[in-house]
């Protein structure tokens, strides 16, 4: 996609709770001029209905072409967003979904690429780091044009939780969750700050929360999805807005720094050949470059452990001949 292109087209694959919430966020925020929604044949009518329903909001926002799409419609899209996959059930971890969702991902990516698509993939289906890797493998695309939502939602949860504790606007809190979007993620406490004031210094001066409180805060952030799933069955609003933010950064060529699932080539020691959550600059051509926050020793160990866990799962999954044969990278 060129930064000057005026008509920007997004294809959404998966019209479930996350996908439909993302579509609504795009309409509500006036992002893109065209949105196609792909669903499996049994749910095609739902995609038709959602497209019609969403179109009724356009008089309040901005013009947009919205329709139930097929894979052929991906050919001239700027961005294909994959939310389709088996949902995470109560008691399941994101990594429990690997087997089911790898097969779904292979089918989707193969059909998108066969359409002649030459844009950017944005992956949100879980486990997102593993499925971002598989999207890269199945597509044969450059790593810069395959992006996962990564720890974008986790970092937003982290910032909001800190903001609530210390009584400031979350937009004034600058802090990241890195690693897997899942149980092995970690907080980068060493670089967390409030309006440029290091969090440690802020807490010394204001005493809003003690050390145990910080531990509890991180656990609540890490386990937020489990809490929500147990209460309402799924999470979708937060990730939908996170995806809309990433979409805007790509379509508007913002060169924004966002925490995403990006390919690792030794930025953090032995962390290689895996997609994992870290800040990166993203624009019209995908990932411009990772932003390599200098981690302290404890954080680096957590990053490496998180990556090793993901790598073990990927290596095990790729023993399946079906996935090996489909790999183009």
From Swiss-Prot:
The active site is at 181 (proton acceptor). It catalyses: (S)-lactate + NAD(+) = pyruvate + NADH + H(+). SUPFAM superfamilies: LDH C-terminal domain-like, NAD(P)-binding Rossmann-fold domains. Substrate binds at residues 88, 94, 126-129, 154-157, 235. GO terms for biological process: glycolytic process; lactate metabolic process. It is an enzyme of class 1 (oxidoreductase). Keywords: Allosteric enzyme, Cytoplasm, NAD, Oxidoreductase, Phosphoprotein. Belongs to the LDH/MDH superfamily. LDH family. Homotetramer. This is L-lactate dehydrogenase. It comes from Streptococcus agalactiae serotype V (strain ATCC BAA-611 / 2603 V/R). The lineage of its organism: Bacteria, Bacillati, Bacillota, Bacilli, Lactobacillales. The gene is ldh.
